[in-house]
Amino acid sequence: MVNTTISLGEVRQDLVRAHNQAIAALSKPGTWWTGAQRRELALTAQLAISELEPVAPWVGISTVANKLPASLTAPKIAHDAIYRISRHAATLTREWYEKVTAEINPLAFVELCGIACTIAPVMAFRRSLGLPALEVGSAESGQPSNNEPDNIVAAQLNWVPVVGPADKDAAVVQAFTAVPETNRVIWAMADAQYIPDKEMVDPNWTRGTLSRVQMELIATRVSQQRECFY
């Protein structure tokens, strides 16, 4: 545990807002999952990240007694997938992805990845500063929108489908495009946590705190430590 005297008031407020809004969205109906399912999957992602002795990547969390609620609203394979993504991302393979998406819609899988990618940075940020965790609120009623863009295509750079034309942007840029609302939330967080997309091409851009070089050094180090190999 990090000992620190930092308060939430000392954190940039645009970053606080981005995190609050992203976590709040987890309990609302999404594109392919209900609010109850999204909240449930978010809690499984939190479990995966926080466990001192995590379940092995080849073991489905849904098969382990007393790990998940007895009554689940999301399919067990979705819980197994988000647990593994959240804790054992370096072990994922295309064969595993194809097995999962044989049982759940590939676009629902994209949204599931977005839930994991919302939980992980917020938890890590707050834990590193000794701040209390943000709680996922009660689930809101309503049905998923099932909003599917017209021009969804297969990609070479990603396992998941993307909005075409494919592979004109980096894999990380096009990864969530097939689920626009998830894409919007993830990039709103990225703008606050890292660099606004429109500023990415400027090597001298800064908020007046860290320089671009310093930011890239930290980002590279975090990526290496987290085994982010994209």
What positions do the PLM features span?
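Hydrophobic alpha-helical segments
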Residues: 1-230
